[in-house]
Amino acid sequence: MINMLPSSWRAAPRPALLGLLLFFCAGFADGALMPFFPLWASSEAGIPVGAIGLLFGCYAGGELLAAPLIGGIADRVGRRPVLIASSLGVGAGFLALFFVHGVAVTAIVLLATGMCESVLHPTILTAIADVTPPSAHPRWFSLARVSSSAGQILGPACGALLALVSLRSVFLAGGTILVLGGIVMFFALNETSGIGHAAGDDRLDGGDDEEEGLSALLPAFRDGRLAKLLLWIVVFEVAGNWIEAVVPLYAQDAGTLTPSGVGALFAYAAALTVGLQMLVIRLVEVRSALWLTVGAGLATILAFALLAASPAMLTLIGAVSLCSIAQMLVGPLVPTAVNALAPPARRASYMAASSVAVDLKDSLGPSIGTALYALAPRLPWIAGIPLVAIASLGLGAAIGRARRPSRPTEDDATPQLGSAVENYR
C-alpha cells in the first residue's frame, strides 16, 4: 500500500492534499447524515416511510436544479471561491436541519443544501486533476475515496453516539465539520485553474470560453460518449444506493439493529474501504473496464441475494461488505474516464455533469427503494438483481469506449486522453 501513495507527502501538490481534506469533511458529514436520516424522519419527525424518499429527493433535486446554472461555474470564476462557498453552504444547510421543524421547512433546507453541494465534489476532483499529471489521476482519485471513506468511518461512529441522545444531533456534527473545512480552504487553498494547461490548450479554451448556457454547462448534451457513460452510471448507482437507503429501515423493522447499530454497520463499511481501496487499485490498473464493472455488478448482486434471503446480522454485514467492494472497483474508474473526455477549458463542467449523474442516486435511489420496500420488504433486493446485471455490462462498455480519442485531429489532446484512461484498459 505504501507504494501506492505519493513518494513524499511534502512534495505532493498542496491543493490536492487540501482536496483530500475536504473529501474527508464531506465524507464525515454524509456518514453522519445518511444512515440516520431515515430513522430520524420515521421516528422523531413522524414522516411515513413512503415519503422519506421524497425528502432525499429534495436534496438531490437541489443539485439537479443548480447544475444547469452553476455546474461549470468553477471553469469561469475559479476553483477556490467555489470550494469555499459550497463547503460553507452545505455545512450551513446541515446545521439548519438541527433547528428546523416540519416537513415543508426540512424540504426547503435540503433543496438549498443540494444546490450548494452540486459543485462541491466535482470541483474538488477538478482541483486535484489541475495539479496532478493524467497518469497519476487513478491513484489520486482512489486517495480521494479513501479520504471520504475515512470520514464515513468517523461520521457514523459519531452519529451512533449522538443518536443515543437525539437523532437530530447528528446534523449538528455533520454541519460543523464542513464549515470548518470551508474555513481551512479560505486560509490555505490557492487557485488551481490554469495550472497544467499546456500552451496547445489555449486554442481549446478560446472557443469554449465564449459558450454560455445549458449546452456549455452540461456537456452531456454535446458529447455523446459522455451521455452514454452517465446513463449507465445513473442506473448502476441508483440500484446500488438501495442498500444504503433501505438497509436502515430493513434492519430496524426486523429488530436486527438499533439506530446506533446501523451507524456502526456503515462505519464498518467505510473502514473496509479505507483498508482495501489502495490495494484494490493494483487490480484496477491491470484489468479491463468491463472486467471491473462486471465484478462490481456480481458483488452487488450477491449482496442483494443475501439481503433477500434474511435480515440477520451476518447477512447485513456481508451485504455492506460486498457493496463496499463494488464501489472500490468502479469508484476511481468513473472520474478518470470522465476527466479523459473533458477538454481542459471544460474540465469542471464535465466533472459536474458526472457528479449530477452519480448524485441522482440520492433522489431516485431512496425514492424508488423506499417505495419498493413499502410494497414488500424484500422487493428492492429482488428487483435490483437484474437491474444491476444490465447496468454493469453497459457501464463497462461505456468506460471502455471512453479510452478512444474523441477529437482525433487535435494532436495535443489525444495523447493526454489516451494516457489518462490507459490504466483502465
Language-model regions: role of each:
Residues L110-A150:
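Cytoplasmic helix-loop-helix junction between adjacent transmembrane helices
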Residues P81-L95, W291-A305:
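Structural signature of the two symmetry-related core transmembrane helices
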Residues R346-A374:
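A late C-terminal transmembrane helix in Major Facilitator Superfamily
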Residues D30, A112-I124, C323-V334:
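Core transmembrane helices of Major Facilitator Superfamily
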Residues A60-P68, Q152-I153, A270-M278, D362-S363:
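Residue-level signature of mid-helix packing/kink "hotspots" within the transmembrane helices
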Residues F36-G50, A245-G261:
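Short amphipathic helix-loop junctions that connect adjacent transmembrane helices
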Residues A66-G78, L276-A289, Y373:
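Helix-to-loop junctions at the C-terminal end of transmembrane segments
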Residues M1-P13, N190-L230, Q416-Y424:
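Juxtamembrane intracellular "pre-TM" segments in multi-pass secondary transporters
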